[in-house]
Amino acid sequence: MKLRPLHDRVVIRRSEEESKTAGGIVLPGSAAEKPNRGEVVAVGTGRILENGEVRALAVKVGDKVVFGPYSGSNTVKVDGEDLLVMAENEILAVIEG
């Protein structure tokens, strides 16, 4: 199954969770914080402006992004993989380099 987001929505594959702290303590699954980074796997057509024009999104498929801890509250399971669906404005930054 393929997921195609609408308008200014973006589908993100969350990065792998860290299971150890910086000090080397292993965290159980429920205690580990979910990472706020991921890779864009699909983008919508763009944001519809008040005048009816469509503004293209600033992110593209393959971009590595950072989003807020409460962003992407819509999780969808596609082919056994959990994907996040969020509005483009919930993305804080694109990781370059």
Swiss-Prot record:
InterPro entries tied to this protein: Chaperonin_GroES, Chaperonin_GroES_sf, Chaprnonin_Cpn10_CS, GroES-like_sf
GO biological-process terms attached to the record: chaperone cofactor-dependent protein refolding
One Gene Ontology term, aspect cellular component: cytoplasm
Pfam families: Cpn10
Gene3D superfamilies cross-referenced by the UniProt entry: GroES chaperonin
Protein role: Together with the chaperonin GroEL, plays an essential role in assisting protein folding. The GroEL-GroES system forms a nano-cage that allows encapsulation of the non-native substrate proteins and provides a physical environment optimized to promote and accelerate protein folding. GroES binds to the apical surface of the GroEL ring, thereby capping the opening of the GroEL channel.
Record-linked PANTHER family: 10 KDA HEAT SHOCK PROTEIN, CO-CHAPERONIN GROES
Family: Belongs to the GroES chaperonin family.
Assembly mode: Heptamer of 7 subunits arranged in a ring. Interacts with the chaperonin GroEL.
Record protein name field: Co-chaperonin GroES
Organism this protein belongs to: Pseudomonas putida (strain GB-1)
Taxon lineage: Bacteria, Pseudomonadati, Pseudomonadota, Gammaproteobacteria, Pseudomonadales
